[in-house]
Amino acid sequence: MAAAVAMRSGSGSDGGGGGYDKAGMDSGKYVRYTPEQVEALERVYAECPKPSSSRRQQLLRDCPILANIEPKQIKVWFQNRRCRDKQRKEASRLQAVNRKLTAMNKLLMEENERLQKQVSQLVHENAYMKQQLQNPSLGNDTSCESNVTTPQNPLRDASNPSGLLTIAEETLTEFLSKATGTAVDWVPMPGMKPGPDSFGIVAVSHGCRGVAARACGLVNLEPTKIVEILKDRPSWFRDCRSLEVFTMFPAGNGGTIELVYMQMYAPTTLVPARDFWTLRYTTTMDDGSLVVCERSLSGSGGGPSTASAQQFVRAEMLPSGYLVRPCEGGGSIVHIVDHLDLEAWSVPEVLRPLYESSRVVAQKMTTAALRHIRQIAQETSGEVVYALGRQPAVLRTFSQRLSRGFNDAISGFNDDGWSVMGGDGIEDVIIACNAKKVRNTSTSANAFVTPGGVICAKASMLLQSVPPAVLVRFLREHRSEWADYNFDAYSASSLKTSSCSLPGLRPMRFSGSQIIMPLAHTVENEEILEVVRLEGQALTHDDGLMSRDIHLLQLCTGIDEKSMGSCFQLVFAPIDELFPDDAPLISSGFRVIPLDMKTDGTPAGRTLDLASSLEVGSTAQPTGDASMDDCNLRSVLTIAFQFPYEMHLQDSVATMARQYVRSIVSSVQRVSMAISPSRSGLNAGQKIISGFPEAPTLARWICQSYQFHLGVELLRQADDAGEALLKMLWDYEDAILCCSFKEKPVFTFANEMGLNMLETSLVALQDLSLDKIFDEAGRKALYNEIPKLMEQGYVYLPGGVCLSGMGRHVSFEQAVAWKVLGEDNNVHCLAFCFVNWSFV
């Protein structure tokens, strides 16, 4: 009886399910495994969750303790064990999703409650206005009640702790009324849709003083960790130059009060930087929530009176901060409010949108903070794995150093050692030198070995009708269009030697080939960190055997076609090929800032939809983001390049730097005209090719030819015509490419998946040829099938590996090529469809 009970109840204690009893295989009852047997099986499972038949046989021979178990029972045990593992992982995933949905639902309920209060308030105001209109005499009522006004809070004495505590408590109250109440009229930020896949709810102010933004979301970190990260503003806010706590004392209620001085970088050479003198109050609420609130102290004379402060305009921070509430089951709900008055009067009128747009504040500060803590949460949980085995914190530090070096060059603060040099009478390029930027010890990360210093040549220019994301992508993908390889080699050589030879002493030639290796990216691809290898070729026989490749560490911001950022950047610095963690960085690059940032408009970084991108000569009005907004888009481009120099070569390097930046400005102007929708007649800057049909016509030819040659439809609703068919082709799940039917086929068209596979854009597509994307085996397979392609009109290619435009390997399961016939039944081009492709 005891044995029978053990057999019936044993299935739950074997760690993975049992096998059939040897004594009664037909009884259908499960065997109860002993703890020793389970331990032996678990050891094997840890090494190999799915052992082969021979491996299971070997297991039975090697473990006498399993001798009484049949191979079939062992197989069933492993099957059950794998099933339980899968169920456990799925249950864990569903629990995490459920926690996120619960927290998001709580946020939405709170937001709904706030909106209901706001609606109620508006209803009362509307009723009052109707009453005023119906009874005009009430508007002139001089009774005591009608003249009641809210008394202004008296100025608090900020010179003693009790006065500061009063200010802190007022700041807390005002901040909470903004974070969870109706003190500010919040409107949803365009393009931000709440939901399980969204990183949070974002809103911007409407009709209040200054500019304000609010964000709230769920983050899988403890509240104390989140507060620690957010208080370290320079670690996540790229525009923050420094933050110094001058005074800190306890508030008496478990909180702390700090007097903080913060400096911000200037976004461009055309405006002065900002600084803040604030009180920061950190405390714990009764419900366990942590609060950090901050506001400017009255008076513009507060804070340190240093020489560097003369280069800043004092801005005001209205009650702002962070509310972090612990969440059931782990994680936290974070509320972030930024409310600033950036003194827009002090900048040229054309640049004032940068200081008068709540959306800019939302993108540069509020959502940046939320994305940063979400990024760290994912890194902490192990969800993010980066190349080269680098730790996420190290790669994040590289991004910060690249950005900080570029900001230092643009702002050129005196206390950093920068001073402006005399010009040549034409004030288009600013030349500044910095003799302090010399590495004397190994701890100075952004300096380097040279007996002189650094020359920085920088310029700013206004752009009209140039999509920022398209421009930055073009500069990234087509370096040979604007860069001089000798100048890259000059900067790179300073990392290896203590001397800085002028370019031209060892003439080099850029092969035109660059290989980009991704290192890291943020959660939503706002930033991409990568290493670029430029292949150089020596022009003299003596240098022929020496490697002349140059490696650059590069940071790209906002190049994603769906980016909604307020800043688009390409920043790079030469590095040693060994790429040590403490590599010195001399940052140079480009920054494009849209000036037409509207809180009620579409994002400046538009999505390049195919219908509007490839129309040639069409008079139809484009739809969606690619409307006339791009033709009227204004932005400011800032260029800054740094060059090391030896003291006796300072003037020569300055002249060289000025001429080089002027040549870059000319190249950028030429590129801008080429990609401008208003000038080229193409909404994405696509070059006009002789004989190239309008996009809807080409889409129809592609689908009709596919059906003609293969006898099946490429698209389910191929009967559609015009832009509807074009949109379906653009959204097709596999990569579709078209190349010219010539001796050297060049790509002329690709759908969205095709552009993603090639890692290029519609602007740069035609610079890729068919032979460049196949390796040797792929080219051989293609050439062998060309006669068959010409004879029957199509051919299937076996799965293999091809190359993207950036040199990355791409595997595909199968490819099909077919001839695309025009209206006259002549071959117009060749089309390829790559099925189930992925990066290796």
Swiss-Prot record:
Coiled-coil ranges per UniProt: 86-135
Q: Which Pfam families match?
A: Homeodomain, MEKHLA, START
* Gene3D superfamilies in UniProt: 3.30.530.20, Homeodomain-like
Report biased composition (Gly residues) as residue ranges: 12-21
Q: Which residues bind DNA?
A: 26-89
Q: Which residues form the START domain?
A: 157-385
User: Which tissues show it?
Assistant: Expressed in seedlings, roots, stems, leaf sheaths and blades and panicles.
The protein's superkingdom reads Eukaryota
Quote a single Gene Ontology cellular component term: nucleus
Keywords, sorted A to Z: Coiled coil, DNA-binding, Homeobox, Nucleus, Transcription, Transcription regulation
Q: Where is this region: Disordered?
A: 1-26, 135-160
GO molecular-function terms, A-Z: DNA binding; DNA-binding transcription factor activity; lipid binding
* Role noted for this protein: Probable transcription factor.
Family assignment from sequence similarity: Belongs to the HD-ZIP homeobox family. Class III subfamily.
PANTHER family in the record, alphabetically?
HOMEOBOX-LEUCINE ZIPPER PROTEIN ATHB-14, HOMEOBOX-LEUCINE ZIPPER PROTEIN REVOLUTA
Name-wise, this protein is Homeobox-leucine zipper protein HOX9
User: What is the taxonomic lineage of the source species?
Assistant: Eukaryota, Viridiplantae, Streptophyta, Embryophyta, Tracheophyta
